[in-house]
């Protein structure tokens, strides 16, 4: 008898978790890239991290409702060439000598979140130190916010080429 009540209780908890993961985006306009049309007054129903359906009008249900009635919603962008661990800056070469892996990880997390908030839902990372892989895993596990990352892990290149970490360094500093 206790097992039946426990099972019913667990089913109720899981149903509540599923309902909590449903989001209703009330959109003024949606850009339909597949058909080349602009759809007006639609509701996008998102369950977990998947678009479940698009409904006519502004609908509500059991879950979070986000009012975007004054906005145009479009599919996420894909950036096919990023290095999520860093950005071009006046201090980028100095940072190769001063930042450790933990510093790079914090910086990469901030870059990933900013990338997602800029509309890029997917990126192709073309190489890093390994932080890129850990960041991808953390995003996939819901630990941090960021885009879907497809990564090459380490950059590939020839000696002296773009991916050679000793490129442009003083010969005495390079080692063997």
Regions found by a protein language model. Give the residues of each.
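Metal-associated gating/positioning segment near the N- to mid-region
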Residues: 72-141, 159-163, 171
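Envelope-exposed proteins and targeting segments
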Residues: 26, 40-42, 119, 145
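Extracytoplasmic
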Residues: 25, 39-41, 60, 103, ...
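Short coil/turn connectors at secondary-structure junctions
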Residues: 20, 62, 143-147
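Bacterial Sec-dependent N-terminal signal peptides
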Residues: 1-22
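Hydrophobic/aromatic beta-strand patches that form the interior of the parallel beta-sheet core
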Residues: 25, 64-66, 150
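Metal-coordinating catalytic core of metallo-dependent amide/deamination hydrolases
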Residues: 143-176
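Histidine-rich, glycine-flanked metal-binding segment
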Residues: 30, 35-74
């Amino acid at each position: 008898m206790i097992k039946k009540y426990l099972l019913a209780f667990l089913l109720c908890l899981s149903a509540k978790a599923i309902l909590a993961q449903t989001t209703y985006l009330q959109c003024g306009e949606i850009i339909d890239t597949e058909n080349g049309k602009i759809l007006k007054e639609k509701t996008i129903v998102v369950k977990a991290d998947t678009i479940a359906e698009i409904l006519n009008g502004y609908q509500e249900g059991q879950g979070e409702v986000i009012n975007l009635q004054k906005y145009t919603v479009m599919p996420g962008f894909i950036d096919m060439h990023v290095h999520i661990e860093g950005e071009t800056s006046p201090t980028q070469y100095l940072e190769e000598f001063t930042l450790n892996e933990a510093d790079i990880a914090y910086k990469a997390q901030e870059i990933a979140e900013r990338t997602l908030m800029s509309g890029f839902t997917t990126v192709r990372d073309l190489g890093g130190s390994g932080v890129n892989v850990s960041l991808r895993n953390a995003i996939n596990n819901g630990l941090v916010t960021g885009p879907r990352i497809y990564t090459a892990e380490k950059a590939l290149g020839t000696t002296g080429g773009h991916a050679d970490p000793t490129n442009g360094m003083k010969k005495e500093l390079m080692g063997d």
